[in-house]
A protein has these predicted regions:
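Bacterial N-terminal signal peptides
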Residues: 1-5
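Short amphipathic alpha-helical surface micro-motifs
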Residues: 7-8, 49-52, 67-71, 83-85
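Conserved beta-strand/loop element in small beta-rich adapter and peptidoglycan-binding domains
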Residues: 55-73
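SH3-family beta-barrel domains
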Residues: 9-52, 61-63, 108-110
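Surface-exposed patches in mature extracellular/periplasmic domains of secreted proteins
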Residues: 72-80
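Boundary regions of SH3-family modules and the immediately adjacent low-complexity/disordered segments
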Residues: 11-27, 77, 84-110
C-alpha cells in the first residue's frame, strides 16, 4: 500500500522533497503498524487503513495534497518486495511543524 506519489527522479526520498498524498497518519506508531501490514499483503494493509480512517488515527483528503518531506523515518520492502519509505511530512509553508506520516514507494522515474 502506498499513500503518496510525485513525478521526477529515481532517487530515494530526502528532506525538503515535495510529495503529494491523499492519506496521512497522525502518529509514528500508527504508520509503523500500517507498514507491518503492508509487508504481509495489500488486502491486510488496505483494510487496516480503512479502520484507522474510521478511528481518526489517519486522515484522507478529497484529492492529493502537497506536503514537504521533513524526515525519512525508515525504508522497508512491501509485500511485492518494492522499496518503500515511511516519511514524516509537513505542510509546504510550515515552520518545522510535522503534520503527520505517509508511505511512499521509491521516487518514480519520468
Amino acid at each position: 500500500v502506498f499513500f503518496s506519489s510525485v513525478a521526477s527522479s529515481a532517487e530515494a526520498w530526502k528532506k525538503d522533497d515535495t510529495i503529494t498524498s491523499n492519506i496521512v497518519c497522525l502518529s509514528e506508531e500508527t504508520i509503523l503498524e500500517v507498514a507491518r501490514q503492508d509487508t504481509i499483503s495489500f488486502e491486510n494493509a488496505s483494510s487496516f487503513v480503512q479502520a484507522l480512517l474510521q478511528q481518526g488515527r489517519c486522515v484522507s483528503f478529497m484529492r492529493p495534497t502537497e506536503f514537504q518531506v521533513d524526515k525519512v523515518l525508515l525504508t522497508y520492502k512491501d509485500h511485492l518486495k518494492r522499496e518503500t519509505f515511511i516519511l514524516r511530512i509537513n505542510y509546504i509553508f510550515s515552520d518545522n511543524n510535522p503534520f503527520g506520516f505517509t508511505i511512499a514507494l521509491q521516487r518514480p522515474t519520468i
